[in-house]
């Protein structure tokens, strides 16, 4: 079977969804600029070799509708001979794009793919036009479509306290701020045009969403937002609403080597798994277990881990049940996570994978895991191996 590898991976800065730096920039533009950037950064690659553009996006309507993958690839000047498809596995969409490209490569159905994802949550709100089937309540808990309440349920089931959640959120902001100040995001961020608070055109080079001033004291003053009477989950311990895109160049290994392109990581294994929709945030546990089994590995073999921080109340039970409580500081979300950076839904899978690969290089690590929960009860996981 052929081997799929990551040749390059980048992302936009993360912009705030409310009056943020990308308020006048469309989702197609964020996407197209990254597609162009991959070609600029890898001049050995003839664009005519691209088999397909596979792009994750959850809210496929308004500017993100009508196959945003194709719209963005045409904007980017990708040859018209390349295909383009938009995929939707909710929060796991752009990680699913990685998996789709890898499966195609492994089965000989192409050797060069641009993948990624986008979500402009400022322009297309996450609940825009959502209309659940009334009969769904006969199969799953009525609150299963309300992500914050599923986090509340998972946190209660695992005894996660408000203080534990607040501490996890503070860590996320502190780590992300330190990564910014120390230049550790520089290799993964592709600067984009945006607008400052006064409307002036600027080059955006850093994430806008991080709040370095976050403390236990400031978070303690926030009220529970999803279950005001009995809850513990606040806006401060939930992933921020943000606008952003991420992208990767995924190739068949021998093809990349023949072109003299760098190989930053191999895709060692992949998995998706389902769980109860009422505790959708638990999905990373079965997905990770499945991916590790397919790779012949255990959690002890993992050097670096990116676990998408949808909610602190969701992340901490996953850490616990994967047996990772003792290695959080050494291995998990070392540059912060979605609580600090935001979770632009269709973007996040390739975003956390990009951050992971850069961390693996920085730490000289061999095996890394990127995993995330998915609304309505799924998880997705990818094991990467540095060459």
UniProtKB/Swiss-Prot annotation:
CDD domains (alphabetical): thiolase
Supply the alphabetized keyword list: Acyltransferase, Cytoplasm, Fatty acid metabolism, Lipid degradation, Lipid metabolism, Transferase
Which pathway or pathways does this protein act in? Lipid metabolism; fatty acid beta-oxidation
Keyword Ribosomal protein part of the UniProt annotation: no
Lineage: superkingdom: Bacteria
Which biological process terms from the Gene Ontology are attached to this UniProt entry? fatty acid beta-oxidation; phenylacetate catabolic process
GO MF annotation terms: acetyl-CoA C-acyltransferase activity
Q: Which residues cross the membrane?
A: none
Cite the Gene3D superfamilies for this sequence.
3.40.47.10
| Name of the protein described by the UniProt record | 3-ketoacyl-CoA thiolase
Q: Which organism is it from?
A: Shewanella denitrificans (strain OS217 / ATCC BAA-1090 / DSM 15013)
Which gene produces this protein? fadA
